[in-house]
Each structure stands twice: as structure tokens, then as C-alpha cells.
Amino acid sequence: MPYYMNIAIGASCFNNGQEDATAASAAVATNPRPYRRDIHTAILPTSPTATSSRAELNALVLALETALERKAGLQFRPRFHLFVKSCSSYVVGIMTEWKAKWQMNGWKDAKGNVIANKDLIERAVQLEEAVTRGGGGFVAYQLVPRKWNGYVNWVARKALQWETKGQ
């Protein structure tokens, strides 16, 4: 019997791409039986410059780390099926379409430039491979409307507000 895990990811960024930008990521894992909601947040470092794209990718890394922890804690090692929901077409596109091409091209785009956010993308790919290692499992990515991702984006925004008020 497979183990199913659902994680919604989201992010918030103030002053996106500016020198003084701050960003936060969130991953909210839910399981129906027993009902459980695990909330994970992270504030992005200021270097490299925080952007909404980096925050969304960092949310994916949080989600995959959460899944890996959960998988390691399972008693019988069932097939592990992870469903990641995101309102970021950038993140979903990377993990479903572009990563294979970029890997073959040495993490370069069609023009020969090193892809943006390579560090986070490589980390996400490594974590995805770790989650599916052992056979029988998979990670699926679903692009959802922003309004469906309201809670997780709110969590990221609140984490960022909390962080910026504390400084």
C-alpha cells in the first residue's frame, strides 16, 4: 500500500529583486488520516539577492526535505507518492519540463548562459531523486490557481512580516 503525501508550497517577497529585498518560503504538508498539518517556513538570506523566484524554489526545497524526513520515519518503507502543489508556473515548469534539458546542457540555457537560481534548482533535483530512491515512488507537480494556494502564501507572508518586524 503506497504512502501519499500532499504538500502545498508558496512564497512572499518584499521589494522583489531589489538590493534590500526580503523573502520567505513556506511548505504546508497535509495528510487526511490521521489529519495532520505540518507547517515549515524559512527566511531567505539576503545574498544572493532575494527574489520571488528564489523564494518559490526554496519553498520546493522545504517541501522535498519535509517529504524526505517523513519517508525516513515510515516503518515499512512503502512506495512513497508525493504531490506538490504550487501556483508558480516557474517552479512547476522547471521540475516537469526544463530540468532534464538543463542537466544535459550542463545547467545552461539555450543561449549557453548558466541558468538563474542554479543552486536551488540543483538542490531540488537532488532531493527529488532522494525521495524517489528505492523504487516504486514518485513526485508529481501540480500547477494550481493562486487562489487555491492562499493559505500557504499567507503563511509565507506572515513569516516574512514577523521577521521584518523583529529587525
Predicted regions and their residues:
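RNase H-like nuclease fold core
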Residues: 1-55, 66-72, 159-166
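RNase H catalytic domain
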Residues: 16, 60, 64-160
